[in-house]
Amino acid sequence: MEEILRLRRSVSIDDYIEKVKPIVEAVKREGDKAVIRFTRDLDGVELDSLRVTEDEFEKAYDAVDDGLIDALEVAKENIYRFHYVTSVERDMKVEFEDCVMGKIYTPIEKVGAYIPGGRASYPSTALMIGVPAKIAGVEKLVACTPPNKDGKVNPLTLVALDIAEFDEVYKAGGAQAIAAMAYGTETVEKVYKIVGPGNIYVTAAKLLVAKDVAIDMPAGPSEILVIADETANADFIACDCLAQLEHDPMAVAVVLTTSRKVADEVEKKVKSEGDFSNFAVFVVEDLAEAFEISNEFAPEHLTVAVKNPEEWLGKVRNAGSVFLGNFSPVAAGDYASGTNHVLPTAGYAKIYGGLSVESFLKHFTFQMLSEESMRRIGGDVVKIAEAEGLRWHAESVRKRLEKI
C-alpha cells in the first residue's frame, strides 16, 4: 500500500500558499489594476479589460465548428438530465406529535467558476459547473478563465460558457483570478463560493481565500485506479490510464488486477507510449484485496473492469466517480454521459464528493411547536439548560410553560 500511495508526489501546499499570498493581497487592494498587472507579468498577456464582450462571444460561435457545438449541446442535455433527476428534495417537512419541523434548501446567490486553461482548454468544465449551478437556481454565475497570448479566450471555451448560461466571463487565470472573485474588483463580481479545478497555484489561492468565501474542494493532479480481473480488456485499460496521464506530469494511474496476463499487457501498452513515473500495475490475490487498497487510496476515478461489476459496487467506500464494466471509459464521464467530472483528488474522496446540484445549495431548518409540544419537552429543556449553566435558556422555556 505504501508503494501505491507514494505514486502521489508529495507537494507542500503551504509553500504555494505563501507564494500566492502577495498576489491575493494585491488584488484585494488594487482590484482590476493588479489582475491586469499579474496577467502581464506572470502569463505574458497584455489586457485592456477583463470582461468578455458580446462581440467576443459572437465571434467565438463563428470560429467553432457546428458539429462541435451540437456535441456540446448533447453533453449539456445529458448533464442536465442526470443532475436534475438526482438532486435533493428542496422542501422537506415532517411532523412529530404536534411539532412541525423541516429543512429547506436555497441556492447560493453568487458563484464564481474557475475554468482552466494552460496545457489545454476545458470547455467541458464550463458545462460541468454551469448546468448544476443553474438547476440549483444560482442567480449570478460568473467565470474566470485564462486568456491566450493574444488576450482572447479560447473560442470553444466561450461557446461552452454561453451554452452553460454563465452570466459573465472574465479574462483572468491563476491566483489573481481566484482573488478577484473572492474579493471583487471594479469589473469582477464578488461571489460567495468558488468552484472548479486548477493548477497548484489556483488550489493554493482557493485555500487561502477559503476563510472569506466557500470553496468546493482542494484539487490536485488527475488520477485513476483500475480494478481488473481476467475478463478485462487490457487495451481499454491502457487507454484509460493514458487518458489520465496526459493531463499532467503529476497525474497518477494505478492498475490492480488478479490476472498476470492483463497486468503484462497493460504495462506493455502504457510504457510503449512513454516513461510515466506515476504509473504502476500490481497483481493482487483477489478482488477483495483490490477494493481494500482502492478504498484506502480513495481515487478520483475508479474503474471496475470485472465480471458482474455491479455486484462489487457495494464494496466501494471512497471514490470520486466509479466506472463499471469494459464499456464505461472515464472519458465518457469527463464529457457526456451526464455525471460530473469535477471530482476530489489526492485522497480527498474520503471526505468530499464530486460537484453536484447540492454544491450550489445551502439549507436552513425550521420548527413550529404547539403548546402540547412545549408541554411535552419543556421540562427536559429546562433541566439540560440549567445543567449547562444557561439561566436564560431555561427561563425562556419556563415562562412559556407557565402560560400553558
From Swiss-Prot:
Pfam families per record: Histidinol_dh
GO molecular function annotation: histidinol dehydrogenase activity; NAD binding; zinc ion binding
E.C. number: 1.1.1.23
Amino acids binding substrate: 222, 244, 247, 301, 334, 388, 393
Keyword rRNA processing: no
Function statement: Catalyzes the sequential NAD-dependent oxidations of L-histidinol to L-histidinaldehyde and then to L-histidine.
Binding, NAD(+): 114, 176, 199
Active site: 300-301
Disulfide bond entries: none
PROSITE patterns linked to this entry: HISOL_DEHYDROGENASE (PS00611)
A GO-annotated cellular component: cytoplasm
Keyword Transmembrane helix in record: no
Protein name: Histidinol dehydrogenase
Annotated residues for binding of Zn(2+): 244, 247, 334, 393
Record's cofactor remark: Binds 1 zinc ion per subunit.
Keyword set, alphabetical order: Amino-acid biosynthesis, Histidine biosynthesis, Metal-binding, NAD, Oxidoreductase, Zinc
PANTHER family: HISTIDINE BIOSYNTHESIS TRIFUNCTIONAL PROTEIN, HISTIDINOL DEHYDROGENASE HDH
Catalysis: reaction(s): L-histidinol + 2 NAD(+) + H2O = L-histidine + 2 NADH + 3 H(+)
Pathway: Amino-acid biosynthesis; L-histidine biosynthesis; L-histidine from 5-phospho-alpha-D-ribose 1-diphosphate: step 9/9
CDD domains associated with the record: Histidinol_dh (cd06572)
Family: Belongs to the histidinol dehydrogenase family.
Domain of life: Archaea
Required cofactor(s): Zn(2+)
Biological processes annotated in GO: L-histidine biosynthetic process
